[in-house]
Regions:
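C-terminal motif of bacterial Sec signal peptides marking the signal peptidase cleavage site
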Residues: 20-23
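Short, Lys/Arg-enriched N-terminal segments with co-localized hydrophobic residues
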Residues: 1-8
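Sec-dependent signal peptide recognition
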Residues: 10-17
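Catalytic glycan-binding domains that act on GlcNAc-containing polysaccharides
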Residues: 27-199
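Residue-level signal for mature regions of secreted extracellular proteins and peptides
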Residues: 17-18, 31
Length: 199
């Protein structure tokens, strides 16, 4: 009887392990060529479909979403901030709770789920992440007056939060101003590329 219980336990453990590994393996890898929007959507049409759906729902252009998501996660579903270290060697946890394609923080993600009723939304799901970005960027229109086509300022509001953006907190961060400029430039490139690859 003990031997049968051990065998059953081993099978159960093996099954659970196999399911966990399968779940981890099922996340698609980031696209290989992030510089060309046409290559990106050919390799990962799910990204384009998710962003088109978010564009229909929230009016945020695909190229703005793509530029912001590139900057936040490089289209990696499991992207996380780096660890903090004490004395340079002792891991002290991650720099923030950001996770997934959109790098949404725990609190902001919870606010999104409450506001939209999308209680089962996951930050590692491209459809949910694109919808979150659309929702958040619409908050930036309402709270900060940032146009949905203004990728640079949308990114600043996304990074700093609307209250921080309204205070101009980004002005004390030259590195962030540089990144926001790059997001705006990338959005312009993606817009041109998307127009050419749809022909």
């Amino acid at each position: 009887i003990v031997e049968q219980a051990d065998t059953h336990m081993n099978r159960t453990l093996f099954l659970v392990l196999a399911l966990v590994l399968a779940a981890c393996a099922s996340a698609p890898p980031p696209p290989r060529n992030l510089e060309n929007a046409c290559d990106l959507i050919r390799e990962r049409p799910d990204i384009y479909r998710a962003m088109r759906q978010a564009e229909r729902q929230w009016d945020v252009p695909v190229y703005v979403q793509m530029a912001a998501m590139y900057q936040e996660s490089r289209f990696d579903s499991d992207a996380r901030p780096p660890y903090r270290f004490a004395a340079g060697v002792i891991p002290m946890g991650r720099q923030s709770s950001a996770l997934g394609y959109s790098q949404a923080l725990d609190g902001t993600w919870d606010e999104y789920r409450r506001a939209t009723g999308n209680r089962r939304a996951r930050r590692t799901d491209i459809r949910d992440a694109a919808d979150f970005m659309g929702w958040y960027m619409n908050q930036s229109v309402e709270r900060s007056g940032v146009a949905l086509t203004d990728a640079r300022n949308q990114y600043l509001a996304y990074h700093e939060g609307n209250a921080g953006f309204n205070r101009g907190s980004y002005n004390a961060k030259p590195w962030l101003l540089r990144i926001a400029r790059e997001v705006g430039e990338r959005a312009d490139r993606y817009q041109s590329q998307l127009a050419s690859c749809r022909r």
